[in-house]
Curated annotation (Swiss-Prot):
Gene designation: rpsZ
Required cofactor(s): Zn(2+)
Protein name according to UniProt: Small ribosomal subunit protein uS14
KW Zinc (keyword) present: yes
Alphabetical GO biological process terms: translation
Stored Pfam families: Ribosomal_S14
Binding of Zn(2+), residues: 24, 27, 40, 43
Length: 61
């Protein structure tokens, strides 16, 4: 879990647009962020496995 101070710091607007970065709103993780789902890969996998994200299915071939 991310430090609370880092999550709050990321939510605040930056003086420069380039310095802003995305964080997962569920766990606060800054890396492996999927813009389409607005969450990190770990939370995406957890929610997709539970069937809580509509339209996402497990692939098999």
């Amino acid at each position: 879990m991310a430090k609370t101070s880092m999550i709050i710091k990321a939510q605040r607007g930056s003086k420069f647009k380039v310095r802003e970065y995305n964080r997962c709103p569920l766990c606060g993780r800054p890396r492996a962020y999927y813009r389409k789902f607005d969450m990190c890969r770990i939370c995406l996998r957890k929610l997709a496995s539970a069937g809580q994200i509509p339209g996402v299915i497990k692939s098999s071939w």
